[in-house]
């Protein structure tokens, strides 16, 4: 029997063509699988997006501890891994795959303009700074934020995360608190990159053609009230958060994003980032040169100020004081403890100087800013790596020596050398005792001394503040 037969030339050509076609079939199958993978991940993103865009009429507590993401009544809570991968890993991979396969990015597909980065934002440029003033409510953050708002080459935004807190349903506690932090972080990253469109799904009512009259505290950002962002005023158009010193038309988000990219630096003031560790991906992002300034204040002063500014949310405290009850609600105590612990743990992390935060973190006490505003402003600018201009120095001189403090609880004009101790005469010692018992570890770290009795609390000659030097700068 013969060992083999020679195939005719036609047969050999047929076999060869089948092999080539087989390779194409495999390649096409691979492409189909990739598209299926993309579609699947898009559904995951859509699922999370749909959950987040539920807009119940709910006013979140601005002072709540560790707000947690709450989905609709019958929806299952997404795991932290789903949230994190959805808002970070999957979106980046989908964007890269889309570019490689020639698919338009989602933003462009929806008719939005892609946000081009300023050349100085590219890795290695080393000149553009992204400053994050991290604080909690009633710590003087609006006042300190003006140090950056008043500098002409800095694009400054005031509390942009307010819209997310008002739009997404939050509750306190639970493992899903980390999920809400991931949402904040994802939005924050896009804002630092001048992608202001990221706010549009959270603004209510929604912007039309990138125009809105409802951006929170627009007037607190000089950059949003300057030309060309300040468009001609439109009569009979109500703008809830209008510019302070001039009439402008509705905010054009596209013009604002372009102005952001033209500025040399970017600064944000936020009171809704609770844990410093969640900012690590931002500090490690090569497109950003993040500088974090954590502002802290005596928790006794913070509580006294909140009871005035947010009176309706502290009725239980007032009732406890007026009725002379022995114990305060455990929920209120735990909320206060949670606030103090978040601040303390974040500061301890910053002061440990992990590699990702080294050279990017500064801890500042409001009391030091109030006593020596110009000196502290210079230190903050030096920490941020930005030269301080005479424009800011002049503003500080004029606005920290006001003849009298404004009656507006949100005013940035203060007789700062006197302001920081006024709380000592407005808070009962009974209330101070509770704060000292609950927030003792944080007070010890920040150098806020305990008051032994009513006399020591109200005696200005007895300092309740330890002197600290460059310990606060890392």
From Swiss-Prot:
Pfam families: Sulfotransfer_1 (PF00685). Residues 1-19 are cytoplasmic. It is found in: Golgi apparatus membrane. It catalyses: chondroitin beta-D-glucuronate + n 3'-phosphoadenylyl sulfate = chondroitin 6'-sulfate + n adenosine 3',5'-bisphosphate + n H(+); 3'-phosphoadenylyl sulfate + keratan = adenosine 3',5'-bisphosphate + keratan 6'-sulfate. Glycans are attached at residues 63, 74, 96, 252, 415, 459. Gene3D superfamilies: P-loop containing nucleotide triphosphate hydrolases. GO terms for cellular component: Golgi apparatus; Golgi membrane. GO terms for molecular function: chondroitin 6-sulfotransferase activity; N-acetylglucosamine 6-O-sulfotransferase activity; proteoglycan sulfotransferase activity. 3'-phosphoadenylyl sulfate binds at residues 137-143, 297-305. It is a single-pass type II membrane protein. The keyword Transcription does not apply. It comes from the Eukaryota. Keywords: Carbohydrate metabolism, Glycoprotein, Golgi apparatus, Membrane, Signal-anchor, Transferase, Transmembrane, Transmembrane helix. InterPro entries: Carbohydrate_sulfotransferase (IPR016469), Gal/GlcNAc/GalNAc_ST (IPR051135), P-loop_NTPase (IPR027417), Sulfotransferase_dom (IPR000863). Its EC number is 2.8.2.17, 2.8.2.21. One of its GO terms (biological process) is N-acetylglucosamine metabolic process. The chain crosses the membrane at residues 20-38. Residues 39-474 are lumenal. N-glycosylated. Sulfotransferase that utilizes 3'-phospho-5'-adenylyl sulfate (PAPS) as sulfonate donor to catalyze the transfer of sulfate to position 6 of the N-acetylgalactosamine (GalNAc) residue of chondroitin. Chondroitin sulfate constitutes the predominant proteoglycan present in cartilage and is distributed on the surfaces of many cells and extracellular matrices. Catalyzes with a lower efficiency the sulfation of Gal residues of keratan sulfate, another glycosaminoglycan. Can also catalyze the sulfation of the Gal residues in sialyl N-acetyllactosamine (sialyl LacNAc) oligosaccharides. Belongs to the sulfotransferase 1 family. Gal/GlcNAc/GalNAc subfamily. This is Carbohydrate sulfotransferase 3. It comes from Rattus norvegicus.
């Amino acid at each position: 029997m013969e060992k083999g037969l020679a195939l005719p030339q036609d047969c050999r050509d047929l076999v060869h063509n089948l092999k080539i076609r087989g390779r194409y079939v495999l390649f096409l199958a691979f492409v189909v699988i990739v598209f299926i993978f993309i579609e699947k991940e898009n559904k995951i993103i859509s699922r999370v997006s749909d959950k987040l865009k539920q807009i119940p009429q709910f006013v979140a507590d601005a002072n709540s501890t560790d707000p947690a993401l709450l989905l609709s009544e019958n929806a299952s809570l997404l795991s932290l891994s789903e949230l994190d991968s959805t808002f970070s890993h999957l979106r980046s991979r989908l964007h890269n795959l889309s570019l490689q396969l020639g698919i338009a990015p989602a933003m462009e597909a929806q008719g939005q303009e892609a946000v081009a980065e300023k050349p100085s934002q590219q890795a290695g440029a080393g000149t553009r700074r992204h400053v994050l003033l991290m604080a909690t409510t009633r710590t003087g953050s609006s006042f300190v934020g003006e140090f950056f708002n008043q500098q002409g080459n800095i694009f400054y935004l005031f509390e942009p995360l307010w819209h997310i807190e008002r739009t997404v349903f939050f509750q306190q506690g639970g493992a899903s608190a980390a999920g809400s932090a991931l949402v904040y972080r994802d939005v924050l990253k896009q804002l630092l990159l001048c992608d202001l469109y990221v706010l549009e799904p959270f603004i209510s009512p929604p912007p039309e053609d990138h125009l809105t009259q409802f951006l929170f505290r627009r007037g607190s950002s000089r950059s949003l009230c300057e030309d060309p962002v300040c468009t001609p005023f439109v009569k009979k158009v109500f703008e809830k958060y209008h510019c302070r010193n001039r009439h402008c038309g509705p905010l054009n988000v596209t013009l604002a994003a372009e102005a952001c990219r033209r500025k040399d630096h970017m600064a944000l003031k936020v009171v809704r980032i609770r844990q410093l560790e969640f900012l690590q991906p931002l500090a490690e992002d090569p497109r950003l040169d993040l500088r974090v300034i954590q502002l802290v204040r005596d928790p006794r002063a913070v509580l006294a100020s909140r009871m005035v500014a947010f009176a309706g949310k502290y009725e239980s405290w007032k009732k406890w004081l007026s009725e002379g009850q022995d114990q305060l609600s455990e929920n209120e105590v735990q909320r206060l403890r949670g606030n103090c612990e978040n601040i303390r743990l974040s500061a301890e992390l910053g002061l440990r100087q992990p590699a990702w935060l080294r050279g990017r973190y500064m801890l500042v006490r409001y009391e030091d800013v109030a006593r020596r505003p110009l000196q502290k402003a210079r230190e903050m600018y030096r920490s941020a790596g930005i030269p301080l201009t005479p424009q800011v120095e002049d503003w500080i001189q004029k606005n920290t020596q006001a003849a009298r403090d404004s009656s507006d609880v949100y005013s940035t004009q203060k007789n700062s050398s006197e302001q920081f101790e006024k709380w000592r005469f407005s808070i009962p010692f009974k209330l101070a005792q509770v704060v000292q018992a609950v927030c003792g570890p944080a007070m010890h770290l920040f150098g806020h001394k305990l008051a032994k009795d009513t006399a020591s609390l109200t005696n200005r000659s007895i300092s309740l503040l330890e002197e600290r030097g460059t310990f606060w700068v890392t």
